[in-house]
């Protein structure tokens, strides 16, 4: 981990971008750059004032190319199309990336994997330490219950979220499926309507709720005969996501070029369940 990584925040004017700026400052690291779309009216504004923490002397830039030389790592919580361009630029420049964007196409996922051969990339659907502890608990529960229970995942988010199910819900499903030796693409059931017939034991169901200002809630249900185990994570604000992403940014600087996730950042791969 770099002692004082130079961190760039992409999508700095967005809700998550502003919180990331706060998190970088709270962690005592250097905010080297804050980037927005070239046409944004925020270009030229002070990043600290935008984030509500006062003047810090870092201006919002409209060009990632111009500021990459000042960064050891960038944090990207933007949109798939934007991240696609950022991957190409950071790969060519050899600048590490921490990516929290969700909703990628298969082609965009392939580009991410290719970029990780050029520069280190941390990619996770959720950077909350609590969520990643939850994933570890799901792996343990899956090992214990095996195929003896029905598994359902319920997720809830604010009304503005555009992808469903959430990346975190899919991450939970993938962790469960992998532990059970299943293929989530084959076993996932994303909606039920009409006469569906009896539930197939191998299926992993997903239910989505959208409304209000829910930051993020995820519950995995292991449903047996006569008992049910529920493992739940609830986020009450976004700082936990931002703090985890900043932790990942500090960790990834200087690592070899490959794709990492929060299991690597938190050392979970060394913990057996």
From Swiss-Prot:
Top-level EC class as recorded in UniProt: oxidoreductase
Residue positions binding NADP(+): 37
GO biological process: diaminopimelate biosynthetic process; lysine biosynthetic process via diaminopimelate
Catalytic residues, chain numbering: 157, 161
Keywords assigned: Amino-acid biosynthesis, Cytoplasm, Diaminopimelate biosynthesis, Lysine biosynthesis, NAD, NADP, Oxidoreductase
Reactions performed catalytically: (S)-2,3,4,5-tetrahydrodipicolinate + NAD(+) + H2O = (2S,4S)-4-hydroxy-2,3,4,5-tetrahydrodipicolinate + NADH + H(+); (S)-2,3,4,5-tetrahydrodipicolinate + NADP(+) + H2O = (2S,4S)-4-hydroxy-2,3,4,5-tetrahydrodipicolinate + NADPH + H(+)
Keyword Transferase: no
Residues bound to NAD(+): 11-16, 36, 100-102, 124-127
EC number: 1.17.1.8
GO molecular-function term, one example from the UniProt record: oxidoreductase activity, acting on CH or CH2 groups, NAD or NADP as acceptor
Positions with a binding annotation for (S)-2,3,4,5-tetrahydrodipicolinate: 158, 167-168
Pathway in which this enzyme or protein is active: Amino-acid biosynthesis; L-lysine biosynthesis via DAP pathway; (S)-tetrahydrodipicolinate from L-aspartate: step 4/4
Subcellular location: Cytoplasm
GO CC entries: cytosol
Keyword NADP: yes
Summary of the function given for this chain in its UniProt record: Catalyzes the conversion of 4-hydroxy-tetrahydrodipicolinate (HTPA) to tetrahydrodipicolinate.
Similarity comment text for this entry: Belongs to the DapB family.
Entry-linked NCBIfam families: dapB (TIGR00036)
Protein name as it appears in the record: 4-hydroxy-tetrahydrodipicolinate reductase
């Amino acid at each position: 981990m770099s002692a004082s990584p130079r961190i760039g925040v992409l999508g700095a004017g967005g809700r998550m971008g502003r919180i990331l700026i706060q998190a970088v400052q709270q962690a005592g690291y250097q905010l080297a750059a804050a980037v927005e779309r070239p046409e944004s009216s925020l270009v030229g504004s002070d990043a600290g004032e935008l984030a509500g923490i006062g003047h810090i002397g870092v201006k919002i830039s409209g060009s990632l190319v111009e500021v990459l030389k000042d960064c050891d790592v960038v944090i990207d919580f933007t949109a798939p199309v934007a991240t696609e361009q950022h991957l190409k630029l950071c790969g060519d420049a050899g600048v590490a990336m921490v990516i929290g964007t969700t909703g990628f196409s298969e082609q965009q996922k392939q580009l991410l994997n290719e970029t990780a051969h050029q520069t280190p990339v941390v990619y996770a659907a959720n950077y909350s330490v609590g969520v990643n502890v939850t994933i570890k608990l799901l792996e343990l529960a899956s090992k214990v219950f095996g195929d003896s229970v029905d598994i359902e995942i319920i997720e809830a988010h604010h009304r503005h979220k555009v992808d469903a199910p959430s990346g975190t819900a899919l991450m939970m499903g993938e962790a469960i499926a992998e532990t059970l030796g299943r293929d989530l693409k084959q076993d996932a059931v994303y909606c039920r309507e009409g006469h569906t017939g009896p539930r197939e034991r191998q299926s992993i169901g997903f239910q989505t709720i959208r409304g209000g200002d829910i930051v993020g809630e995820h519950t995995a249900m292991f449903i047996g005969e006569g008992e049910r185990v529920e493992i739940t994570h609830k986020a009450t604000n976004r700082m936990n996501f931002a703090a985890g992403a900043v932790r990942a940014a500090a960790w990834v600087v200087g690592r070899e070029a490959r794709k990492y996730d929060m299991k690597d950042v938190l050392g979970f791969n060394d913990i057996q369940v």
